[in-house]
A protein has these predicted regions:
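The feature encodes the CheY-like receiver
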Residues: 69-70, 99
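A short, hydrophobic beta-strand element within the central beta-sheet of small alpha/beta folds
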Residues: 88-99
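Active-site residues of response regulator receiver
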Residues: 65
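Acidic, metal-coordinating helix/loop segments flanking the phosphotransfer/catalytic sites
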Residues: 43-61
């Protein structure tokens, strides 16, 4: 008998995700999963490709593998922090090198969210919710109502989770 769990998925409010991952199979799995709940995923195979994407496009979340050819995750983060500082809190780091003191020290120094490979996809959803929640808390916009003059506060780019998906 298999056990199944149900996870909330976002409405069709399209979220943009930059996925930096050198492993083709893993990247395809993550991309397909995220597209199931209306995320637009752009993949970069290394930090150089990632920077090109960051310059051209805005992203709601950045999934960043730490070990990539040409330009590893820590160097990519530092470069992004310089050109688009507001993106520094949109990172979710992914690595299979849990015992590596270099990656551990870096991730701790930037207070990064981390997914240790292999990870269950619901952990990815949880991490993304955390990034979106932080973004909403930081980007609260004030709207004044014309009819009543009342002040209403609402988050920009909300990420509602009302669809449901069962993973067995």
């Amino acid at each position: 008998m298999s056990s199944s769990q149900t996870y909330d998925l976002p409405e069709t409010n399209l979220q943009t995700v930059l996925l930096l991952e050198a492993d083709n199979e893993f990247a395809a799995t993550v991309k397909k999963f995220l597209e199931l709940y209306s995320c637009r995923v752009t993949r970069a195979r290394n930090g150089v490709e990632g920077l090109q994407q960051i310059i051209r496009t805005d992203f709601d979340v950045i999934l960043c593998d730490m070990v990539m050819p040409t330009f590893p995750g820590d160097k990519f983060y530092i470069a992004v922090e310089r050109i688009k500082p507001r993106y520094s809190e949109r990172f979710i780091f992914m690595t299979g090198h849990k015992a590596d003191p270099k990656w551990d020290a870096f991730i701790r120094s930037v207070r990064g969210l981390t997914l240790w490979k292999p990870f269950p996809m619901h952990d990815l959803l949880t991490a993304m919710r955390t990034v979106f929640r932080r973004s909403r808390e930081r980007d609260v916009v004030d709207y004044s109502t014309v009819m009543t003059g009342a002040l209403v506060t609402a988050p920009k780019g909300s990420f509602p989770f009302s669809k449901r998906m069962t993973i067995q």
